[in-house]
Protein backbone atom coordinates (compact mmCIF):
# COMPACT_ATOMS: atom_id res chain seq x y z
CA UNK A 1 0.00 0.00 0.00
CA UNK A 2 1.21 3.50 -0.82
CA UNK A 3 1.67 6.09 1.90
CA UNK A 4 1.23 9.74 0.95
CA UNK A 5 3.24 12.41 2.78
CA UNK A 6 2.05 15.97 2.20
CA UNK A 7 4.98 18.36 1.88
CA UNK A 8 2.90 21.42 0.97
CA UNK A 9 1.91 24.05 3.54
CA UNK A 10 -1.79 23.29 3.02
CA UNK A 11 -4.05 20.38 3.92
CA UNK A 12 -4.89 18.61 0.65
CA UNK A 13 -8.48 17.37 0.34
CA UNK A 14 -9.57 14.90 -2.33
CA UNK A 15 -13.05 15.03 -3.83
CA UNK A 16 -13.96 11.88 -1.87
CA UNK A 17 -13.18 13.69 1.42
CA UNK A 18 -9.80 12.07 2.08
CA UNK A 19 -7.47 14.62 3.68
CA UNK A 20 -3.70 14.83 3.81
CA UNK A 21 -2.53 17.30 6.48
CA UNK A 22 0.76 19.09 5.94
CA UNK A 23 3.73 17.15 7.30
CA UNK A 24 6.37 19.70 6.33
CA UNK A 25 7.23 21.84 3.34
CA UNK A 26 9.41 20.99 0.36
CA UNK A 27 10.36 23.96 -1.79
CA UNK A 28 12.74 25.02 -4.53
CA UNK A 29 15.36 27.53 -3.47
CA UNK A 30 15.53 30.74 -5.47
CA UNK A 31 17.52 33.91 -5.88
CA UNK A 32 16.49 37.25 -7.34
CA UNK A 33 18.18 40.09 -9.19
CA UNK A 34 17.47 43.70 -8.33
CA UNK A 35 14.26 45.16 -9.71
CA UNK A 36 14.67 47.18 -12.88
CA UNK A 37 13.06 50.57 -13.43
CA UNK A 38 9.83 48.81 -14.47
CA UNK A 39 9.61 46.85 -11.23
CA UNK A 40 10.68 43.57 -12.87
CA UNK A 41 13.41 41.25 -11.62
CA UNK A 42 14.78 37.87 -12.70
CA UNK A 43 14.48 34.74 -10.60
CA UNK A 44 16.81 31.74 -10.72
CA UNK A 45 15.60 28.47 -9.24
CA UNK A 46 18.03 26.23 -7.41
CA UNK A 47 17.95 23.04 -5.39
CA UNK A 48 14.99 21.33 -3.78
CA UNK A 49 14.92 21.90 -0.03
CA UNK A 50 12.95 19.76 2.43
CA UNK A 51 12.35 16.72 0.21
CA UNK A 52 13.33 13.51 2.04
CA UNK A 53 15.22 10.71 0.36
CA UNK A 54 13.17 8.18 -1.58
CA UNK A 55 11.41 5.62 0.61
CA UNK A 56 9.83 2.44 -0.70
CA UNK A 57 6.04 2.76 -0.76
CA UNK A 58 5.98 6.53 -0.10
CA UNK A 59 4.74 9.23 -2.48
CA UNK A 60 5.45 12.82 -1.54
CA UNK A 61 2.74 15.40 -2.28
CA UNK A 62 4.53 18.57 -3.38
CA UNK A 63 3.83 21.79 -5.29
CA UNK A 64 3.89 21.80 -9.08
CA UNK A 65 7.20 23.70 -9.00
CA UNK A 66 8.81 21.12 -6.71
CA UNK A 67 7.36 18.31 -8.84
CA UNK A 68 8.95 19.80 -11.96
CA UNK A 69 12.34 20.11 -10.25
CA UNK A 70 12.07 16.61 -8.77
CA UNK A 71 11.26 15.10 -12.17
CA UNK A 72 14.24 16.92 -13.70
CA UNK A 73 16.39 15.37 -10.95
CA UNK A 74 15.09 11.88 -11.80
CA UNK A 75 12.74 11.50 -8.84
CA UNK A 76 9.63 9.40 -9.49
CA UNK A 77 8.20 9.49 -5.97
CA UNK A 78 6.58 12.93 -6.11
CA UNK A 79 3.07 13.98 -7.09
CA UNK A 80 1.23 17.30 -7.06
CA UNK A 81 -2.45 18.05 -6.49
CA UNK A 82 -4.38 17.93 -9.79
CA UNK A 83 -5.48 21.57 -9.51
CA UNK A 84 -5.93 21.99 -13.26
CA UNK A 85 -8.12 18.91 -13.73
CA UNK A 86 -11.72 19.60 -14.83
CA UNK A 87 -13.03 17.68 -11.79
CA UNK A 88 -11.27 20.02 -9.36
CA UNK A 89 -13.87 21.54 -7.01
CA UNK A 90 -13.76 25.33 -6.53
CA UNK A 91 -15.83 27.67 -4.39
CA UNK A 92 -15.67 31.45 -4.69
CA UNK A 93 -12.56 31.09 -6.84
CA UNK A 94 -10.67 28.94 -4.34
CA UNK A 95 -9.82 25.25 -4.64
CA UNK A 96 -11.83 23.16 -2.18
CA UNK A 97 -10.74 19.70 -3.31
CA UNK A 98 -8.95 17.88 -6.10
CA UNK A 99 -9.82 14.58 -7.80
CA UNK A 100 -6.32 13.19 -7.29
CA UNK A 101 -2.71 13.87 -8.13
CA UNK A 102 -0.52 14.40 -11.18
CA UNK A 103 2.89 12.89 -11.71
Which sequence ranges carry the predicted segments?
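Intrinsically disordered, low-complexity segments enriched in small/polar residues
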Residues: 2-3, 7-11, 15-103
Amino acid sequence: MTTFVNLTPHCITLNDGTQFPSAGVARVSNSFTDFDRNGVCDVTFGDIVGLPNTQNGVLYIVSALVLSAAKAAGRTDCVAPATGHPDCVRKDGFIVSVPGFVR
